[in-house]
Regions:
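Catalytic glycan-binding domains that act on GlcNAc-containing polysaccharides
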Residues: 21-122
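C-terminal motif of bacterial Sec signal peptides marking the signal peptidase cleavage site
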Residues: 17-18
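Sec-dependent signal peptide recognition
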Residues: 3-12
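Intrinsic disorder/low-complexity signature
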Residues: 2-3, 117
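Short linear sequence elements within intrinsically disordered, low-complexity coil regions
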Residues: 12-14, 109
């Protein structure tokens, strides 16, 4: 049983360390790309594919989610106190709603795309 707990703890530590955090300075694209080099590669490939400049991609993500991979709209309040449902199903870097994201996955053939992954959101 002790070995199981050790294995579980190590696995949990590895999973948590693999999670992406918000870049330190989201106002400076150079510092973002210094922290996350792969993000630059993904943004550059998106620029080649769609023609959208990198600074425009980053500006949209900054306004939509502020580079928070788990960003969701704030919950509405019931009687101004009780948290209620969210106004939309938008989520992740792109803040795409469920229907739009499903359409994107069907059109691109990328069934494993997630809204919380930067590569898929740009």
């Amino acid at each position: 049983m002790y070995k199981f707990y050790n294995f579980f703890f190590i696995l949990l530590t590895l999973l948590i360390s693999a999670c992406s955090s918000i870049p330190q300075n989201t106002s400076n694209s150079c510092s973002i790309f210094n922290e996350r080099y792969l993000w630059y590669k993904h943004a550059k490939s998106t620029e080649k594919k769609w023609g959208t400049p990198i600074h425009v991609q980053l500006a949209i993500i900054k306004m939509e989610s502020d580079f928070d991979w788990l960003a969701k709209p704030q919950r509405q309040k019931l009687f101004k106190v009780i948290p209620f449902k969210r106004p939309s199903s938008s989520f992740g870097y792109s803040q795409a709603v469920k229907g739009t994201w499903e359409q994107y996955k069907n059109e691109t053939g990328n069934k494993l795309a997630t809204r919380a992954r930067f590569k898929d959101s740009v």
